[in-house]
């Protein structure tokens, strides 16, 4: 494959040399290879974007490009935006892999900025509407065959693993290292075991990238005493450490957690983010902890990183203007009978489960309107009671309208401005389960018996019967 020679933008301060915990024969053989080719580099940008490239060349591959703007109804913004020159460089990538549909990974404004030049690769999930969407809009797109190595350059291959939760992982084999991009997939133990078995057979240093901060409604609960936090920052650090040690990772790159929350109704969540300082404070893994926004030489494992004082956040005046405009639009919106009926249909897909979980029912506070859901009757209707049901989900009206009409109601729990007021003592994890159930319907797994069986079958196959080959030599 021929790549263009370019200047790599975005030099970062600080440099250090790292050593894998073990002496790998594969690394010793690399010196001869490097004499013939420029060094292979790994760089993290944006939120969950990695770029794999050779020095002086355009990327062989990038992933999950959220590079401009915001996501989740103007709530999430990047800590550090790439420069226009860096985005131009990324737009020349040969391939773009999208792990899953969440907008902080499948971000259409960023993809439009990158253009139709790259080939867009997607996991072979049970439902693949995103693939048809890309093709329909003039992009080159295809699904990557699961659990099969695919060459993308000289001595560089990728392997995609689809998961039951409509997410995927991407493994990248290079001459001197194995890159394990778990993003925020949270693979179950059997999948981690299969990856570990394959990685042991390959025998190269391992670089793990995965999220380390909450991206759900886990801290969105309120009772009469204030915020009910289900998991502290240390929980997320301990999880990453366990994954690192389970996979015998040599290095960990903080990843897929580089967002801040800027709406006036979501900024509270910044106090519950897991930060890089938390990672350093609680780190107990044998893997080497690297900073966010790092460029890593895959031959000798030297690296440099962008210091926090050099981050490029969005201009403050622009954030204030855009979030203010969104909040004004929320307040001006009105729910229609069609919107209410659509939400009722969505809930009734799980009517009997919800009756078991919440026999007293629950409610939605949508601006000035409160709608109570009675699972036994399967009805969502106006409620004048302030204490009816187990909990109240507080959601801005326009956001609810858009979530129902776009069939992505489960994403409300990720927004950080949706709050859940507990009206009585019960396990808040049941509400978390509600959003997980809604995702099953959002992604089309209940459209037909065939769709449900396809999803369940693939989930079983790629969890309990997963067999990963080593890359061809």
Task: Locate each region found by the language model.
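Cap/insert and terminal regions of metallo-dependent hydrolase folds
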Residues: 190-285
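Feature captures hydrophobic
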Residues: 297-473
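Pre-active-site segment of Zn-dependent metallo-hydrolases
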Residues: 33, 55-101, 108-113, 187-204, ...
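Catalytic core of the metallo-beta-lactamase
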Residues: 45-57, 145-146, 150-203
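Zn-dependent metallo-beta-lactamase
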Residues: 1-82
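Active-site neighborhood of phospho(di)ester-bond hydrolases with catalytic His/Asp-centered motifs
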Residues: 62-64, 92-106, 121-125, 180-185, ...
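Active-site-proximal loop/helix segment associated with metal-binding centers of metalloenzymes
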Residues: 65-66, 75, 161-176, 185, ...
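Metallo-beta-lactamase
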Residues: 8-10, 14-37, 117-177, 281
């Amino acid at each position: 494959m021929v790549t263009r020679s370019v200047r790599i933008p975005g030099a970062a301060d600080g440099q250090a040399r790292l050593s894998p915990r073990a002496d790998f024969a594969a690394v010793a053989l690399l010196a001869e290879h490097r004499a013939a080719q420029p060094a292979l580099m790994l760089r993290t940008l944006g939120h969950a974007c990695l770029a794999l490239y050779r020095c002086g060349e355009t990327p062989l591959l990038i992933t999950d490009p959220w590079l401009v703007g915001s996501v989740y109804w103007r709530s999430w913004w990047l800590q550090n935006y790439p420069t226009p020159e860096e985005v131009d460089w990324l737009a020349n990538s040969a391939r773009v892999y999208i792990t899953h549909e969440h907008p902080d990974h499948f971000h259409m404004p960023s993809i439009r900025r990158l253009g139709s030049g790259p080939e867009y690769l997607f996991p072979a999930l049970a439902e693949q509407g995103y693939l048809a969407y890309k093709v329909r809009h003039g992009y080159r797109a295809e699904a990557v065959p699961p659990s099969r190595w695919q060459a993308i350059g000289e001595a560089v291959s990728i392997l995609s693993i689809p998961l039951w939760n409509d997410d995927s992982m991407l493994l990248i084999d290079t001459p001197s290292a194995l890159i394990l991009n778990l993003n925020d997939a949270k693979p179950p133990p059997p999948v981690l075991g299969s990856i570990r078995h394959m990685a042991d057979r390959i025998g190269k240093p391992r670089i793990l990238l995965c999220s380390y901060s909450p991206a759900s409604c886990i801290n969105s609960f309120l009772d009469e005493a204030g915020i009910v936090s289900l998991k502290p920052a240390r929980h997320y650090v301990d999880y990453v450490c366990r994954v690192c040690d389970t996979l015998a990772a040599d290095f960990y790159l903080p990843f897929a957690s580089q967002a801040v929350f800027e709406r006036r109704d979501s900024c509270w969540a910044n106090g519950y983010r897991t930060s890089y300082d938390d990672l350093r404070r609680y780190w107990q893994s044998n893997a080497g902890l690297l900073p966010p926004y790092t460029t890593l030489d895959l031959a000798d494992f030297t690296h440099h990183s962008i210091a926090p004082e050099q981050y490029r956040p969005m201009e403050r005046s622009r954030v204030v203007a855009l979030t203010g405009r969104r909040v004004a639009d929320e307040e001006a919106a009105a729910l229609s009978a069609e919107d209410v009926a659509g939400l009722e249909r969505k809930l009734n897909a799980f009517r009997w489960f919800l009756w078991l979980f919440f026999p007293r029912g629950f409610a939605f506070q949508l601006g000035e309107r409160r709608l109570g859901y009675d699972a036994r009757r399967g009805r969502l209707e106006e409620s004048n009671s302030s204490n009816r049901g187990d909990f109240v989900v507080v959601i801005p009206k326009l956001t609810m309208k858009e979530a129902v009409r776009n069939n992505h109601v489960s994403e409300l729990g990720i927004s950080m401005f949706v709050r859940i007021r507990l009206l009585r003592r019960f396990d808040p994890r049941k509400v978390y389960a509600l959003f997980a159930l809604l995702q099953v319907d959002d992604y089309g797994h209940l459209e037909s018996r065939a769709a449900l069986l396809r999803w369940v079958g693939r989930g079983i196959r790629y969890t309990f019967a997963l067999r990963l080959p080593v890359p061809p030599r």
